Amino acid sequence: MPQLNPGPWFAILVFSWLVFLTIIPTKILSHISPNEPTPVSAEKHKTESWDWPW
């Protein structure tokens, strides 16, 4: 019975886990945080306050 021969199946198992542990986490992490947070600038806005003309 060839299905009891662990040679080819073990290689397939190791290769599939290698794919899961190297490629899949990078794909998942890129979707979890797609954008880097932009730093908040400490500059004051250049708009000036104005009063209502009444």
Swiss-Prot record:
GO terms for molecular function: proton transmembrane transporter activity. The keyword Transmembrane applies. Pfam families: ATP-synt_8. It is a single-pass membrane protein. The keyword Mitochondrion applies. Residues 42-54 have a biased composition (Basic and acidic residues). It is found in: Mitochondrion membrane. Keywords: ATP synthesis, CF(0), Hydrogen ion transport, Ion transport, Membrane, Mitochondrion, Transmembrane, Transmembrane helix, Transport. Residues 35-54 are annotated as: Disordered. Belongs to the ATPase protein 8 family. Subunit 8, of the mitochondrial membrane ATP synthase complex (F(1)F(0) ATP synthase or Complex V) that produces ATP from ADP in the presence of a proton gradient across the membrane which is generated by electron transport complexes of the respiratory chain. ATP synthase complex consist of a soluble F(1) head domain - the catalytic core - and a membrane F(1) domain - the membrane proton channel. These two domains are linked by a central stalk rotating inside the F(1) region and a stationary peripheral stalk. This is ATP synthase F(0) complex subunit 8. It comes from Carassius auratus (Goldfish). The gene is mt-atp8.
